[in-house]
């Protein structure tokens, strides 16, 4: 129940505060960006747990397994493996980068969370899976003509506004348009 409430809180915050892109299809774009932000916010919990447990951020086997599972789920809804990879390879990289930045900051004296770390297996990973499946559907539903440099730049601004670095924002928003 605690995990579900955490997920609802993160989602509500992301959707309530996601500014409109002002572009054609903006509702779909806003939902996609809000889900990207939610996934990144969950990465903060992952980072805190890994920091407290002295676990390395990079877990290439886990990342490969996630991508394989998402490709399988993507096929079920009509996406190609390339379409799934186009969205999720950058999302996984952005998550990893956000975790690395947070952990480096904590090691060098940035304020640390005051809450105890959550259980990676039982609490955090189910949230990552849930939001990733939502992202898959939103990616499928997004009209291809919505992808543009303007959309990508707007998404970067929204991600930065949620407290992520320009580097994380650039990586996470990269599938949304050329640039």
Residue ranges and their predicted role:
Residues 3-12:
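Sec-dependent N-terminal signal peptides
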Residues 50-54, 109, 142, 146:
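Secondary-structure edge/capping motif, primarily at the C-terminal ends of alpha-helices
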Residues 47, 71-75:
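Amphipathic alpha-helical segments within well-ordered protein domains
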């Amino acid at each position: 129940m605690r995990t579900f409430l955490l997920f609802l809180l993160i989602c509500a915050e992301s959707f309530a505060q996601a500014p409109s892109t002002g572009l054609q299809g903006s509702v779909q774009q806003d939902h996609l960006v809000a889900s990207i932000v939610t996934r990144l916010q969950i990465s903060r919990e992952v980072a805190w747990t890994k920091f407290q447990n002295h676990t390395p951020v990079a877990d290439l086997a886990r990342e490969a397994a996630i991508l394989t599972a998402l490709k399988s789920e993507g096929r079920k809804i009509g996406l190609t493996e390339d379409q799934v990879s186009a969205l999720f390879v950058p999302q996984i990289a952005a998550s990893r980068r956000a975790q690395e930045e947070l952990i480096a900051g904590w090691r060098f004296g940035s304020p640390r969370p005051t809450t105890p770390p959550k259980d990676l297996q039982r609490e955090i990973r189910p949230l990552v899976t849930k939001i990733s499946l939502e992202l898959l559907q939103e990616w499928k539903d997004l009209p291809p003509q919505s992808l543009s440099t303007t959309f990508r730049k707007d998404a970067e601004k929204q991600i930065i506004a949620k407290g992520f670095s320009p580097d994380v924002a650039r990586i996470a928003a990269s599938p949304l348009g050329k640039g």
